[in-house]
Structures are given as C-alpha cells and as structure tokens.
Amino acid sequence: MKYNVGEIRYEKGVSLRKLAQQARVSKSYLQKIEAGEAKPSLEIMVRLAQVLDRPLDQLYQVE
C-alpha cells in the first residue's frame, strides 16, 4: 500500500516535524509512512487526514 501523505504535506506547506507533532506520531514513524516502509493503523491515518484537512481516502494511493 502506498500513501499520499508526503505529497499532501508538501502541497500544504507543512513540515514533517509539525505534522508528526499534530498527529501525535514520531517524526521517524511519519518518515516511514511517507516512504512506504510502515503500515499505519486506521487511527493514525484518520489523525493525519484531520491535520491535513483532507478526506481519508485521499491519503491512500491506488496502485
């Protein structure tokens, strides 16, 4: 599964550190999500969607 978190974060002009803090995840874990090296829980994806002000489905990339 791939995620659009990094692209959306970049578009919104939000730093990795700020998004990690607001979504209550570690910066290193967020980096792994963006790199496709981690499979975040639905709860974490919901928090990321809320912070990024995007619908949850936009955070997932269909392959």
Residue ranges and their predicted role:
Residues 9, 20, 49:
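The alpha-helix within a helix-turn-helix
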Residues 4, 32-35, 47:
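Alpha-helical transmission elements in cytosolic ATPase-linked domains
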Residues 13-32:
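Short alpha-helical DNA-recognition segment
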Residues 1-11:
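A short, Lys/Arg-rich alpha-helix, primarily the initiator
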Residues 6, 17, 46:
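Residues within the helices of the helix-turn-helix
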Residues 43-58:
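DNA major-groove recognition helix of helix-turn-helix/homeodomain DNA-binding modules
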